[in-house]
């Protein structure tokens, strides 16, 4: 789980984890794709019966607009989601130049007790007003991977009390709604596995409740050859019948012998067979400060071909 840090220009860093070119999809480029239909879920960002495919883009030596243009040329399509990371006290954006793409903001958390107790309400209100001014429907992922021990807002670093996270999340939700940020869809997004992996730190302990969550997210990377099913099925099984699922961070590293292309093919197949997944966001960067890994999907011609095949398939035309 890389964690990009502050502001959209800062590089995040992938989530902590435990540890051959894909075939053409049926009807790939020439496919006549009917319009996607809404599923009735997702709040301000409605889930469709097709997958929205997007990315966190931080390509070395390129601006966001240059990176978007490169991916447009390579894939023959737009990013449906553009993911950015913003610090807890940073001034949130009220406008972003990403065309028709849906903005996803991962908003860093902070120590939980002051948030839960109201001492950080002014920060929350300022963020709510800025994002309300954005006006367009967008996704907000606050204090992600709370079931891990690598962030200051993680439950294990806050008295091992998941209830503090739940209270803080609900408070933020209420303040956003009170300040007119009705365009903001709330994403609750644990890591695929918990650290420590104990019953007291189980991801479900941190769930704020259906009334406070529009989408359920999950972070999971191919660090140790885990399959997409291994990474995402626990969240899909627990929440997929109630909320649309967004894979908020994922990517593969190259283990050799075409492994990245093969894994992308497996990701495509898993998502195509999992109707509750409504969005997938690739962690598309080669400048991760705390990692030697290159998460770009164009590190080889076969990996690019596999990703292009996925991006052009009907299931990913949301």
State each model region's role.
Residues 1-51, 312-318:
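N-terminal low-complexity, Pro/Thr-rich disordered segments
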Residues 42-123, 252, 281-282:
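N-terminal substrate-binding region of glycoside hydrolase catalytic domains
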Residues 49-54, 58, 137-139, 144, ...:
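Substrate-binding cleft of secreted/luminal carbohydrate-active enzymes
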Residues 69-77, 90-104, 126-136, 205-211, ...:
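Acidic (Asp/Glu)-rich catalytic clusters
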Residues 79, 203-226, 283:
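Aromatic- and acid-rich polysaccharide-binding/catalytic face
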Residues 91-93, 97-102, 106, 218-256:
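Glycoside hydrolase catalytic-domain groove-lining segments
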Residues 92-190, 294-302, 307:
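Substrate-binding cleft of extracellular glycoside hydrolase catalytic domains
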Residues 169, 173-201, 244-255, 279-285:
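Aromatic-lined carbohydrate-recognition surfaces of secreted/lumenal glycan-active proteins
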């Amino acid at each position: 789980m890389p964690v990009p840090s502050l502001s959209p220009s800062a590089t995040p860093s992938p989530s902590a984890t435990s540890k051959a070119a894909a075939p053409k999809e049926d009807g790939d480029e020439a496919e006549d794709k009917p319009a996607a239909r809404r599923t009735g879920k997702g709040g301000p960002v409605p889930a469709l019966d097709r997958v929205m495919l997007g990315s966190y883009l931080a390509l070395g030596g390129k601006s966001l607009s240059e990176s978007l243009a490169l991916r447009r040329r390579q894939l023959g399509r737009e990013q449906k989601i553009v993911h950015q990371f913003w610090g807890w006290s940073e001034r949130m954006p009220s406008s972003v130049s990403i065309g028709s793409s849906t903005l996803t903001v991962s908003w860093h958390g902070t120590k939980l007790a002051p948030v839960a107790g109201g001492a950080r309400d002014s920060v929350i209100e300022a963020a709510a007003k800025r994002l309300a001014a954005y006006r367009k429907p967008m996704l907000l992922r606050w204090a992600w991977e709370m079931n891990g021990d690598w962030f200051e807002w993680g439950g294990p670093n806050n008295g091992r009390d998941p209830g503090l996270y739940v209270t803080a999340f609900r408070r933020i939700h209420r303040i956003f709604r009170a300040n007119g940020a009705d365009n903001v869809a709330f994403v609750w997004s644990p890591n695929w596995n918990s650290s420590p992996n104990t019953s007291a730190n189980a991801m479900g302990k941190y769930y704020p409740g259906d009334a406070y969550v529009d989408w359920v997210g999950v972070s999971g990377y191919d660090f140790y050859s885990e399959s997409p099913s291994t990474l995402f099925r626990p969240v899909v099984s627990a929440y997929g019948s109630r909320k649309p699922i967004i894979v908020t961070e994922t990517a593969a590293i190259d283990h050799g012998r075409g492994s990245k292309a093969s894994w992308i093919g497996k990701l495509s197949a898993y998502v195509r067979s999992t109707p509750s997944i409504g969005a997938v966001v690739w962690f598309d960067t080669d400048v991760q400060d705390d990692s030697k890994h290159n998460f770009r999907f164009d590190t080889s011609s076969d990996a690019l071909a596999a990703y292009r095949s996925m991006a052009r398939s009907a299931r990913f035309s949301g």
